[in-house]
């Protein structure tokens, strides 16, 4: 690529191709995890979206001969409003880069630009779990982010109340934070599965006995990842003393490794969170992602040029996220804390 002779329009075409290729290379792990229900928000429809849960009875009622059938009871659950945020980043291709043919530096800048918005989205969605034991945190831009569910409690909590937004639900409480926060092991996995069996209710206080949990999520910690793989992929009981012992966990869950799970609000490493893990139900998720603006590229024709003679390119995107309730996910910090 001879930068010293290329026109701005030709360079923009090349920049767009490089940007799209870089963007397409991202795995978008959290967005594609199945844990978030994604909605494309139409333009000119406001900057907020409200989500809620509605539950029916789990069981039918008796109907005697000649009697009218009883109507199912509909219960409004909690509500959660998400608000759009706009993410942006610009780069400048300087006149020196163009005139002196610094192609590698230019390619590096364009490649980086293609990843910035989607990387921030992945971090924001990851921090739903990273800060799942907190009610709020301050992000890298200094903004306060509410980490609560619709009941104003942290996502992972010991006593979520099922009364609902209109307080017409049940006085039953449930927990989705595993007691004593054990590290991933056979015993702790069975403990968290007990939360599924005994602590998963609808807003009528009825046990949801058949809610399928299909994801085992962890961070990238090698020991935790390897432990998860041993349980999910062994053909025999990993803790069994005899060969040929059946492994009850084989193919029971899809293992979701979340690369940015053990991070600070600024995206730096946070070893205090390296052992976080849990399970989740994708089909019953109440986590929502609204996309107001898909990630797009701005060119010098749109951003303009300045007295530095730089050609300016920018990435933009807008989205919002939030969780209505914690019923679909169970978690442990893995640090042994009470």
What is each of the regions a protein language model found here?
Residues 14-15, 53-59, 78-80, 174-183, ...:
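Generic detector of short, locally flexible boundary/turn motifs and exposed helical patches
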Residues 1-29:
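N-terminal alpha-helical "arm" segments
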Residues 32, 47, 112, 127, ...:
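Short, surface-exposed, charged/polar-biased interaction segments
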Residues 78-136, 213-216, 313-315:
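Long, contiguous amphipathic alpha-helices that act as assembly "spine/axial" helices in icosahedral shell
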């Amino acid at each position: 690529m001879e930068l010293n002779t290329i026109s701005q329009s030709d360079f923009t075409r090349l920049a767009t191709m490089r940007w799209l290729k870089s963007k397409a290379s991202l795995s978008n792990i959290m967005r594609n995890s199945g844990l978030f229900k994604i909605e494309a928000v139409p333009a000119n429809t406001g900057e907020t979206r409200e989500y809620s849960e509605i539950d029916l009875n789990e069981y039918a009622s008796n109907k005697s001969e000649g009697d009218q059938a009883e109507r199912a009871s509909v219960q409004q659950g909690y509500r959660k409003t998400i608000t759009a945020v706009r993410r942006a980043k610009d780069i400048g291709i300087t006149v020196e880069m163009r005139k002196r043919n610094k192609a590698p530096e230019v390619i590096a800048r364009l490649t980086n630009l293609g990843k910035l918005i989607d990387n921030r989205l992945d971090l924001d969605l990851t921090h739903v779990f990273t800060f799942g034991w907190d009610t709020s945190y301050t992000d890298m831009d200094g903004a306060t982010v509410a980490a609560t569910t619709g009941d104003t409690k942290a996502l992972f909590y010991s006593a979520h109340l099922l009364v609902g937004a209109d307080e017409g639900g049940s006085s039953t409480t449930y927990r989705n934070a595993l007691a004593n926060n054990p590290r991933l092991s056979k015993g702790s996995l069975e403990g968290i599965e007990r939360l599924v069996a005994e602590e998963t209710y609808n807003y009528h206080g009825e046990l949801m006995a058949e809610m399928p949990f299909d994801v085992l999520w962890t961070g990238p910690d090698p020991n935790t990842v390897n432990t998860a793989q041993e349980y999910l992929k062994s053909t025999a009981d990993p803790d069994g003393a005899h060969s040929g012992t059946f492994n009850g966990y084989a193919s029971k869950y899809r293992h979701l490794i979340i690369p940015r799970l053990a991070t600070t609000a600024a995206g730096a490493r946070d070893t205090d969170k390296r052992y976080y893990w849990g399970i989740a139900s994708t089909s019953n998720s109440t986590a929502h992602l609204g996309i107001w603006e898909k990630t797009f590229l701005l060119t010098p024709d749109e951003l303009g040029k300045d007295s530095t003679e730089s050609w300016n390119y920018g990435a933009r995107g807008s989205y919002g996220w939030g969780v209505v309730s914690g019923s679909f996910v169970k978690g442990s910090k893995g640090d042994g804390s009470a």
